[in-house]
Amino acid sequence: MPYQNILTAFDGSALSVKALEKAIKFAQDHAARLEVIHVCHIPVPVFGGPLYAAPFNEDKDYLLAAQAIIDEAKRLTSQLPDVQVILKQGQPALAILEYAEESGCDLIIMGSRGLGGLREFVLGSVSHHVVQHSKVPVLIVK
């Protein structure tokens, strides 16, 4: 059964560009709808007690950077007729999985972060978490 609704995660990195290119090809080959998601994770610093909210300017900087990434995704997908580019805020892996379920996508395509070694073991990766918890197939592009 061909894919009908493809979701790709995009963060502006070289690997996410490769993943988006693969997603565009899949969408064209299967006459599928393509959705591109970028998740803006604004960290909340904790200093040994109550939460400290980041100053508004820091939040604004994150959102401006996110908008630049969204604009790049729109530019890269401009040749497709039925593309939706979505900006979410939160933990990237959780937001991707939540949106995948909400949107009814039947394939997720994303780049491998490639943290490697100890960093990936300790920190994990967005792609690893998505692969482990997704209810639909996930294609990881390296």
Model-derived regions, located:
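A short acidic, glycine-rich active-site loop
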Residues: A54-A68
